[in-house]
Amino acid sequence: MVVLPQPVTLDNHISLIPTYKPVPVLTSHSIPVVNLADPEAKTRIVKACEEFGFFKVVNHGVRPELMTRLEQEAIGFFGLPQSLKNRAGPPEPYGYGNKRIGPNGDVGWIEYLLLNANPQLSSPKTSAVFRQTPQIFRESVEEYMKEIKEVSYKVLEMVAEELGIEPRDTLSKMLRDEKSDSCLRLNHYPAAEEEAEKMVKVGFGEHTDPQIISVLRSNNTAGLQICVKDGSWVAVPPDHSSFFINVGDALQVMTNGRFKSVKHRVLADTRRSRISMIYFGGPPLSQKIAPLPCLVPEQDDWLYKEFTWSQYKSSAYKSKLGDYRLGLFEKQPLLNHKTLV
């Protein structure tokens, strides 16, 4: 296992990190696994999106050396002295962040680097990160991004085929668009001492991803948990050689709620640090998001109002991490969403 070259001290100005009791791995809720080379893959993907909003993919086609190299480069960055890392922050939203998650008071036992995944829309903070890191860091990010994007396109095109969405690239073209608002996030969760009464620190609090799809890969340290239909939390066994796919809020809307955006969180491990890398596939800011007419022909049957990605992104940025953000865009907002998750 790759480890950080030196202990990491997070921002000491923030001391109140939320805690939870650990949850067991619930074997009754086996995480769906999809072999992308399987002729039945598209059927399995849709079933997983309907039942969990989450699944693991194997035989994904991303070269293992790219995954390992980007992890090593991330470890190198997070192992830098704090003063050097701070030059890449604070995030706006791109750049380096430490404990603070967003602008509305959410905190976690985490440091992270958020990079714009679209070279056509390079941000000043992303450029600053590349200036302060070796050339191999940028090369690793760019090569990894090329291959992970192909995974996301393939998954979305399989979804379209299985649901009968025409044309086949209806979903994937939003991510292929030169103005796609996608990003890559590198997370580092340092090992954290166990709190009193066996409580553990929250690395990243419960939330859903607002984009269309998220593709996650981590090292072999546990911590990721998802919320299943009965409201219980399930610990996801780590697998450094595979990817985990999350349904995002935008895809939930486009399928009119048939797919569910999965609520998830990360708890800090008390023994080992965790490195994760997530590609968030988002559409262009001007893209209209609404139930797809080929799936829901009558607008009276739509559960959601039409909105642009820019509108939703702006709304999400003003909310707390755990807020039910889609509630503002439902045609008949739920009075008590907590009873339904």
From Swiss-Prot:
Keyword annotations: Dioxygenase, Iron, Metal-binding, Oxidoreductase
Q: Write out the residues that bind 2-oxoglutarate.
A: R274
Q: Which residues form the active site?
A: R274
First-level EC class:
oxidoreductase
Q: Which reaction does it catalyse?
A: gibberellin A1 + 2-oxoglutarate + O2 = gibberellin A8 + succinate + CO2
Top-rank taxon = Eukaryota
Q: Which GO terms describe its biological process?
A: cellular response to hypoxia; gibberellin biosynthetic process; response to red light; response to red or far red light
Where, by residue number, does Fe cation bind? H207, D209, H264
Regulation: induction: Up-regulated by cytokinin, auxin, paclobutrazol and gibberellin A3 (GA3).
* Annotated ranges, domain Fe2OG dioxygenase: 179-283
Tissue expression summary: Preferentially expressed in flowers, siliques, and upper stems. Expressed in cotyledons, at the base of the shoot apical meristem and developing leaf primordia.
What Pfam families does the record tag this protein with? 2OG-FeII_Oxy, DIOX_N
Which cofactors does the annotated protein need, by name? Answer: Fe(2+)
Q: Which family does it belong to?
A: Belongs to the iron/ascorbate-dependent oxidoreductase family. GA2OX subfamily.
Q: What is this protein called?
A: Gibberellin 2-beta-dioxygenase 2
What species is this protein from? Answer: Arabidopsis thaliana
